[in-house]
Amino acid sequence: MPALQAGRGSGAKIAVAGAIWGASLLLSRVVGLVRDLVVGRTLGTSGEGDLWQAAFTIPDFLNYLLAGGALTVVYLPIAAGHLALGDEAGAQRSFRRVWSLLLALLVLATVVLWWSTPRILDLIAPGMGAERHAELAALVRILLPAQICHVLGGLASAWLQARDKHAAAASAPLLYTLGIIVGGLLGGDVEGFCWGALAGSIVGPLCVPTFAALRGGLRLRFEWTPRDR
């Protein structure tokens, strides 16, 4: 009987998680469509639309460089393994070490890319006029810090998912997209969309899952020790 009850409990958790992520996916499609409509109506087929697309080139490279999306997949079994053994201290410790390392790498990479943005644009967009070049560089620099939010927030989401808590992680992309929409509507130009993307990244991918993890018992601090003493 205990095994049967445990199986039913596990099945219920899977069903709830599936419902949450299914609803999130559906809402993300709807909100994403609204975002595309707002971007299209606001920027149209002007040069600003091209700037909006080009502004993500360097930030997306930073995310790719640090394998932001893959980190959640990699960390989940690590956290689940600690929890399966009842090792809460180990789960806390492993999270802090990964989080601390990522934060250091992200800040360093962001600073380097922020400083190098004009030179990188010379390589990937040669022949661009000086005014357009300066405008694109400014947009890229607005978006670069957002990658810190996405990567660290993804790690916090993995912490929550390992504990079968999915609502905060599932709502993060929705809030990010809503930030883009609100920024574009308020600003009315490509810069407004970029500021909205940054604000949405802070609120959605970073703050919501991180605060949920802290409320759920995560004790977050810098920890650099490579091995247990």
Cite the ranges covered by each PLM segment:
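Membrane-embedded alpha-helical bundles of multi-pass transporters/translocases
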Residues: 1-229
